[in-house]
């Protein structure tokens, strides 16, 4: 039987870049042309094999509107990974991405895996952000970079597979600490009671 690891992943980025569409495509293999903006955050899960483990992604899709920005730390706190999404047809969304990365580096978990997703690559004829720029920036911060299209299901699975590969495997010899909770029978000492 394969071990299941729960990995909290948050998606960050401007409103309208396609965060919810990426999550829907990954989890449900569905694209909604009329998707509404996320209010606060939404949550979905999907389990995928990775080596001799199963990774259960606990995906928090955060709202991109400025008024919800202050809620973001609540979602990326304790995350194993963050996907920062920008729209390849909107240069401003790439600049905002850098603010998210700065915030993650200052306030996020120390060893968080970062992935940059340049979404809407199906619209490359109206591209404003060259892939070269995204690759150079990703390399400078030690992040994965993938161009995706939630609409056409391009590189969505590859994005999450890349994150899975960056997560260090559990060390079963590490003092028995697997990052989980140990459950077992505990006998009460004579004369000691709970309350």
Swiss-Prot record:
* Example GO molecular function: GTP binding
Q: Tell me the Gene3D superfamilies matching this sequence.
A: P-loop containing nucleotide triphosphate hydrolases (3.40.50.300)
**Enzyme nomenclature, EC number:** 3.6.5.2
Residues covalently joined to lipid (S-geranylgeranyl cysteine)? 194-195
Checking InterPro entries in the record gives: P-loop_NTPase (IPR027417), Small_GTP-bd (IPR005225), Small_GTPase (IPR001806)
Regulation of its activity? Regulated by guanine nucleotide exchange factors (GEFs) including RIN3 and GAPVD1 which promote the exchange of bound GDP for free GTP. Regulated by GTPase activating proteins (GAPs) which increase the GTP hydrolysis activity. Inhibited by GDP dissociation inhibitors (GDIs) which prevent Rab-GDP dissociation.
Which UniProt keywords are listed?
A: Cytoplasmic vesicle, Endosome, Golgi apparatus, GTP-binding, Hydrolase, Lipoprotein, Magnesium, Membrane, Metal-binding, Nucleotide-binding, Phosphoprotein, Prenylation
Motif Switch 2 per UniProt: ranges: 63-79
Q: Where does GTP bind?
A: 16, 18-21, 32-33, 38, 64, 119, 122, 150-151
How does it sit in the bilayer? Answer: Lipid-anchor
Subcellular localization is given as:
Early endosome; Golgi apparatus, trans-Golgi network; Golgi apparatus, trans-Golgi network membrane; Cytoplasmic vesicle, Phagosome
SMART domains named in the record = RAB (SM00175), RAN (SM00176), RAS (SM00173), RHO (SM00174)
Q: Which PROSITE patterns match?
A: RAB (PS51419)
**Catalysed conversion reaction:** GTP + H2O = GDP + phosphate + H(+)
Q: Name one GO biological process term.
A: endocytosis
Q: Which cofactor does it need?
A: Mg(2+)
Q: Which residues carry this modification: Phosphoserine?
A: 36
Q: Which top class of enzyme applies to this chain?
A: hydrolase
**PANTHER family linked to this entry:** PTHR47978
State the domain notes.
Answer: Switch 1, switch 2 and the interswitch regions are characteristic of Rab GTPases and mediate the interactions with Rab downstream effectors. The switch regions undergo conformational changes upon nucleotide binding which drive interaction with specific sets of effector proteins, with most effectors only binding to GTP-bound Rab.
Question: Which family is it part of?
Answer: Belongs to the small GTPase superfamily. Rab family.
Its recorded name reads Ras-related protein Rab-31
Organism (species): Rattus norvegicus (Rat)
Q: What is the lineage of its organism?
A: Eukaryota, Metazoa, Chordata, Craniata, Vertebrata
């Amino acid at each position: 039987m394969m071990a299941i690891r729960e990995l909290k992943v948050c998606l960050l980025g401007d409103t309208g870049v396609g965060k919810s569409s990426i999550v829907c495509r990954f989890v449900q293999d569905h694209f909604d042309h009329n998707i509404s903006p996320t209010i606060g955050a939404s949550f979905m899960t999907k389990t995928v094999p990775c080596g001799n483990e199963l990774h259960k992604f606990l995906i928090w899709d955060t709202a991109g509107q400025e008024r919800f920005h202050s809620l973001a730390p609540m979602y990326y706190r304790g995350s194993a990974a963050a996907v920062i999404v920008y729209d390849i047809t909107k240069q401003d969304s790439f600049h905002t991405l850098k603010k998210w990365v700065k915030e993650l580096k200052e306030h996020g978990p120390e060893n968080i895996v970062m992935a940059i997703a340049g979404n809407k690559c199906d619209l490359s004829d109206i591209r404003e952000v060259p892939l070269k720029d995204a690759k150079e920036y990703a390399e400078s911060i030690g992040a994965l970079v993938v161009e995706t299209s939630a609409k056409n299901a391009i590189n969505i699975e590859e994005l999450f597979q890349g994150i899975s590969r960056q997560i260090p495997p559990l060390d079963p010899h590490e003092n028995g600490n697997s990052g989980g909770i140990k459950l077992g029978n505990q006998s009460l000492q004579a004369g000691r009671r709970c309350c």
